[in-house]
């Protein structure tokens, strides 16, 4: 169950270190296990999310933290939008204009994550927006491959050329901002 403490004060996104139970519940419902011994890492710089730029009132700053796992270093993460390999966490983006983009390099149209250390052959297709960027790393231990698709940035008729729909788990994970504007999902 999510509470206000699970979200940043200055941003609409949830805090990765607060949603491990959410990842475990989702994984359990899909028949996989994502239990892992994460290491909590906290960045030295403060995080001022989207609410900070929308208000002229004083506001609280957040600390941006993430959960590391040695297994992430072995993952092959491909950003197909820009045809390049990326990391699970891009620490350079953590000091940029939108620090939340440190999670899987932000909102990209198509990302694949291959986990050579997975104890399963299960695959996940995740239709998502930016909210899943911090959740997806927590699902990596339960899957051999995760394909992240943001259909706001890729034509749905092109999906079959990128994704082989054959016995994968499928998860639709969108914020209320996207769900309340269904035209974004066409």
What are these regions (language model features)?
Residues 1-186:
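Extracellular glycan-modifying ectodomains
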């Amino acid at each position: 169950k999510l509470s206000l403490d699970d979200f940043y004060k200055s941003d609409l996104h949830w805090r990765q270190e607060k949603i491990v139970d959410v990842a475990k519940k989702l994984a359990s419902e899909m028949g996989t296990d994502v239990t892992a011994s994460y290491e909590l890492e906290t960045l030295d710089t403060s995080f001022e999310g989207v609410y900070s730029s929308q208000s002229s009132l004083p506001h609280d700053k957040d600390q941006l933290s993430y959960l590391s796992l040695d297994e992430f270093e072995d993952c092959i993460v491909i950003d197909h939008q820009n045809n390049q390999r990326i990391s699970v966490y891009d620490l350079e983006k953590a000091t940029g204009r939108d620090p939340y983009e440190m999670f899987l390099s932000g909102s990209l149209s198509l990302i694949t994550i291959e986990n050579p250390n997975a104890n399963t052959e299960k695959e996940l297709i995740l239709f998502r927006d930016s909210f899943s960027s911090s959740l997806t790393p927590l699902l990596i231990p339960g899957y051999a491959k995760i394909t992240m698709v943001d259909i706001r940035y890729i034509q749905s008729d092109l999906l079959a050329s990128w994704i082989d729909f054959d016995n994968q788990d499928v998860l639709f994970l969108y914020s209320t901002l996207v769900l309340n504007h269904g035209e974004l999902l066409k």
